[in-house]
């Protein structure tokens, strides 16, 4: 299942290099981030959310990983989603990596998004986090766990996303 944008195109324009080819995610970290954002988008669409924007940017301010719409019977909620992935370690899990500073940045970019897309300005808003805590342990140096793509640190089947709904709030919204 692919993560499709079901509404008007709100995502940022793709920068074009001199040879008219779009810039590709080239670093391993960028590819890994894109992979987990795609997984999160597909997971949330399976839960009934509708994709509004993916990787929406406000230059010199920040980026929103996913902006989705959750339709309710009484009202709809615009959901700003931060996707995080971290290998399990003693430094804490993926959800803990969304610091107060990162939260402020996401809120600031969300304000710009709402200002630019005023048709959503009356919607209830929520800030969620999708966290992937992956495993990259090997049994030995010579053995490879075939369930794990070492380049992308793909989650094992038992590693499901942790969906933190309303993970943080925007005061004085």
From Swiss-Prot:
One of its GO terms (molecular function) is nucleic acid binding. NCBIfam families: PRK12497.1-3, PRK14687.1, YraN family protein. SUPFAM superfamilies: Restriction endonuclease-like (SSF52980). It comes from the Bacteria. It comes from Psychrobacter arcticus (strain DSM 17307 / VKM B-2377 / 273-4). Belongs to the UPF0102 family. This is UPF0102 protein Psyc_1908.
